[in-house]
Amino acid sequence: MIDIKLLRKEPEIFYNALEKRAMDKEIIDRILVLDREWRSILAEVNNLKAKRNELSKMVAKLKAEKKDIEAEELIKESKGIGEKIKKLDERQKRLEEEMKNLALEIPNIPHESVPVGKDETENVEVRKWGTPRKFDFEPKAHWDLGPELGLIDFERAAKLSGARFTVMYGLLAKLERALIQFMLDVHTKEHGYTEVWVPHLVRREVMIWTGKLPKFEDESYNTKKDDLFLIPTAEVPITALHAEEILKEKELPKKYVSYTSCYRREAGSYGKDVRGMIRQHQFDKVELVWFTKEEESFNALEQLTRDAERILQLLELPYRVVNLCTGDLGFASAKTYDIEVWLPSYNDYKEVSSCSNITDFQARRANIKYRGSDNKTHFVHTLNGSGLAIGRTLVAIMENYQNEDGTITIPKVLVPYMGVEKISI
């Protein structure tokens, strides 16, 4: 949620933000028109209340002087003012609701360090780690390698659920589980995160609080009878854990990690990554979420990103980090780093994590604050990132660690979790 006071005071900030995101700026004008009417009504209501208070004093004085007829006239006038105030209050509430609904459609303001660009082609590479492997044989894509090993079954998955679902068997299913446990262990033991287990179904308000609704309703799975939503990411329930709460300053930063399955309709991705496991309706992810103070949030983003990178380094998978441009930036994000792992089947890097500073955007919607040393309450800043997406990491291992004989070598750090060094038929 944007800061209405800031919009009122400095609308140019929001005009510029929407221009950088290549979005229509008309919505700002609509809110400002409604806000002017709202403030005009507020002033009128305050004047009417002041007049009614004066009349009440005059009525009391007249009654004390036994001037009941004059007092009755003023009482009638006061009732008329009361009716007018009631109508104005109703109009004011309608304006507030309309402004709130419009404000929910405005994205976060990009940070000054975010490059201006139209789409993902203008994202800026920040750094690379590792060197893509040069094969002395023709490497296979995971969508061929998995079925040949008898460990991935796209056909039966389609029979069960339709397109963009996967069934895995045996050691590949175990590798998925091993990756989850490995990531949770690293983040809890080395990086100091608190593990949390959360529901996979959340109320509509929770999706609004975290910026997923109303914009992404078409992308979401919804249970119509109960109006509960399957989570698109663990970020949603974790961030909402502290909705309507005032945290203590000494508690910050709060750092949570959670493993969940994630559910996305991918309504806007028709024709993208149609083969294999890159873009699924259901996928596993380990999520990292921070709650911190405003002045610390951008340093926290750097640390959060390094925490996610550490997983790929331990797995010895080559990757790069890119700073997303304004045209590719997420709706709720002020700044995002994508971590992209090298995939031989694409001869390119593919996103395996997005690490974002949401600033106070979600905190304003969910009313998450902390009490500072000044004894005043302030909105927290929230951050989130994948630490990592399990399926895409598994794909990266399959493709980068494959052997000419069709087997897959297990990364050294995962051998204790797997109990074997290779996956074979």
UniProtKB/Swiss-Prot annotation:
L-serine binds at residues 233-235, 287, 386. Coiled coil: none annotated. One of its GO terms (biological process) is seryl-tRNA aminoacylation. It is an enzyme of class 6 (ligase). It is found in: Cytoplasm. Pathway: Aminoacyl-tRNA biosynthesis; selenocysteinyl-tRNA(Sec) biosynthesis; L-seryl-tRNA(Sec) from L-serine and tRNA(Sec): step 1/1. Keywords: Aminoacyl-tRNA synthetase, ATP-binding, Cytoplasm, Ligase, Nucleotide-binding, Protein biosynthesis. ATP binds at residues 264-266, 351-354. GO terms for molecular function: ATP binding; serine-tRNA ligase activity. InterPro entries: aa-tRNA-synt_IIb (IPR002314), aa-tRNA-synth_II (IPR006195), aa-tRNA-synth_II/BPL/LPL (IPR045864), Ser-tRNA-ligase_type_1 (IPR002317), Ser-tRNA-synth_1_N (IPR015866), SerRS_1_N_sf (IPR042103), SerRS_core (IPR033729), tRNA-bd_arm (IPR010978). GO terms for cellular component: cytoplasm. Its EC number is 6.1.1.11. It catalyses: tRNA(Ser) + L-serine + ATP = L-seryl-tRNA(Ser) + AMP + diphosphate + H(+); tRNA(Sec) + L-serine + ATP = L-seryl-tRNA(Sec) + AMP + diphosphate + H(+). It comes from the Bacteria. Catalyzes the attachment of serine to tRNA(Ser). Is also able to aminoacylate tRNA(Sec) with serine, to form the misacylated tRNA L-seryl-tRNA(Sec), which will be further converted into selenocysteinyl-tRNA(Sec). Homodimer. The tRNA molecule binds across the dimer. Consists of two distinct domains, a catalytic core and a N-terminal extension that is involved in tRNA binding. Belongs to the class-II aminoacyl-tRNA synthetase family. Type-1 seryl-tRNA synthetase subfamily. This is Serine--tRNA ligase. It comes from Thermosipho melanesiensis (strain DSM 12029 / CIP 104789 / BI429). The gene is serS.
